[in-house]
From Swiss-Prot:
Enzyme type, top EC level: hydrolase
Lineage: Eukaryota, Fungi, Dikarya, Ascomycota, Pezizomycotina
GO cellular component terms given for this protein: extracellular region; fungal-type cell wall
Keyword Cell wall biogenesis/degradation part of the UniProt annotation: yes
Biased composition (Basic residues): 113-125
Compartments, record wording: Secreted
The species this protein was found in: Arthroderma benhamiae (strain ATCC MYA-4681 / CBS 112371)
Motif (ExDxxE motif): 350-355
Biased composition (Basic and acidic residues): 100-112, 177-186
Protein known as: Probable circularly permuted 1,3-beta-glucanase
Length: 440
């Protein structure tokens, strides 16, 4: 959704001829054809550069050229998840494809990382308590939550309470602001067969469970130690936030509703320590995104109508959205006053999964944002899910295709592993499909 209020019309206009021939309609500068259940994106530019921010000081930002490569271009790098209300978030999961030879934790280091030592693996060789450990045992890839810290055994933690998701109070573990929450509850090893997809993150607001995630907002630009000149900054959510609270273990929503116009950001639970993320904004909270070229995002959500209207384009009411950003964007500035303080303008990548472009509209568009000549979005749309549905976003490196599918039935539970057959079903056409080829 980043900047799409400004550039959405331009992208739609670029396909105006095709849309007109297909009998589609221009509504408010955006082209709409008909509703579909599946949109595929192919033809990504597989190599290129963007301007990676390397300094933020004195109201100015510096950058250097960063090279990327892979089936999905810059979207093959770490991504952050962004949700805008009105929305009910019931559950969310992220998966990476397993390997028969060794666990595929990350892609090989980028050229920038090789030059500057910002390798994710280098800074995470020692597993801390609460970290997920992956190993090969008897030829099988297994993972578990590390409970051994090298010293005395940790004291047992109590299981999460079970209040209803709409109850106003939740049990506090003392977390507030940037303090570290308790470690998540342990669970046993998970066998991952070669070719299967392993769950690396989960949010379940019904069970009040979360693993492998951090919840943030972009309101940290006014915190102590954060330079206000650069605009919005990441801040981890705490007890003082108006629509999220804390439970025993990791933080989780006390209510599944994201209020109208509010934004929620979800990143991994791995903080950017020791320069493992490269440069991040001084004073702001910083976490790794969800990496790997092959990845799946599943969302169980509803986008109810509110009938409200914002005072300006900067106040998007009754316009829910789900989008993915290159994690380098929010780690510096998602909405910068100076565009050089974000890599967005130079093409580091955004994918709008489902976005309502006008207040109260019942149509959701999807769009890929990178360098303008390589950007694009389908003129076909998804029906706004006023009732709960599952949304699947599949980055399949085997065929270089990104699949976005809405499922009104099935896949309402997100298991620890997905088989290749499960993923085929997620990517299968049910008859209402649009295949969009990018101009790579």
């Amino acid at each position: 959704m980043h900047y799409s209020l400004f550039f959405g019309a331009a992208l739609a206009a670029s396909v105006s001829t095709v849309s007109a021939e297909a009998g589609c309609n221009n509504d408010g500068g955006n082209w709409y054809c008909s509703a579909v259940d599946l949109i595929t994106y192919s033809g990504f530019s597989t190599s290129g550069t963007y301007d990676l921010v390397t300094s933020m000081s004195g109201g100015k930002c510096g950058s250097e050229k960063h090279e990327y490569s892979g089936a999905f271009g810059p979207l093959g790098e770490e991504l952050s998840i962004h949700l805008r209300g009105p929305m009910q978030l019931f559950s969310m999961a992220v998966y990476n494809r397993g390997s028969g030879e060794k666990p595929k934790r990350e892609l090989k280091p980028s050229i920038h990382e090789r030059r500057h030592g910002h390798s994710h693996q280098r800074f995470h060789e020692k597993r801390a308590v609460g970290d997920k450990v992956v190993a090969i045992i008897d030829g099988q890839v297994v993972s578990w939550i590390n409970e051994y810290a090298g010293g005395a055994p940790a004291a047992p933690t109590s299981a999460p309470g079970a209040p209803g998701i709409n109850e106003p109070q939740v049990k506090s573990n003392g977390y507030k602001g940037g303090d570290k929450p308790k470690d998540p509850k342990p669970h046993g090893p998970v066998n991952v067969a070669p070719g299967d997809w392993r769950r690396v993150a989960l949010v379940d607001t019904d069970k009040q469970e979360a693993e492998g995630v951090s919840f943030l907002n972009n309101n940290g630009g006014w915190d102590k130690g954060v330079d206000q000149a650069f605009g919005a900054a990441l801040k981890r959510l705490g007890l003082d936030d108006d629509f999220f609270g804390m439970g025993d273990g990791p933080n989780f929503p006390k209510d599944p509703t994201i209020p109208d116009g509010k934004e929620l950001i979800i990143m991994s639970d791995k903080s950017c320590e020791g320069g493992s993320c490269g440069f991040t904004r001084p004073g702001a909270d910083a976490f790794h995104g969800f990496g790997g070229e092959d990845k799946i995002f599943l969302f169980r959500v509803a986008m109810p109508l509110t009938g409200t209207r914002g005072s300006s384009i900067y106040d998007p009411k009754d316009m829910p959205a789900i989008w993915l950003l290159n994690a380098n964007i929010p780690r510096t500035s998602q909405y910068p006053m100076d565009p050089t303080c974000s890599c967005w303008k130079s093409g580091c990548g955004e994918f709008d999964v489902l976005e309502v472009l006008a207040p109260g509209d019942k149509r959701c568009k999807s769009t890929y944002h990178t360098k303008q000549e390589l950007s694009g979005g389908s003129s076909y749309y998804f029906d706004r899910p006023e009732e709960p549905i599952t949304i699947a976003v599949v980055f399949n490196g085997d065929d270089g295709t990104l699949y976005v599918k809405t499922l009104k039935e099935g896949f309402d539970k997100f298991p620890e592993t997905l088989s290749p057959e499960d993923v085929k079903k997620l990517c299968a056409s049910d008859g209402k499909t649009n295949n969009f080829a990018l101009a790579s």
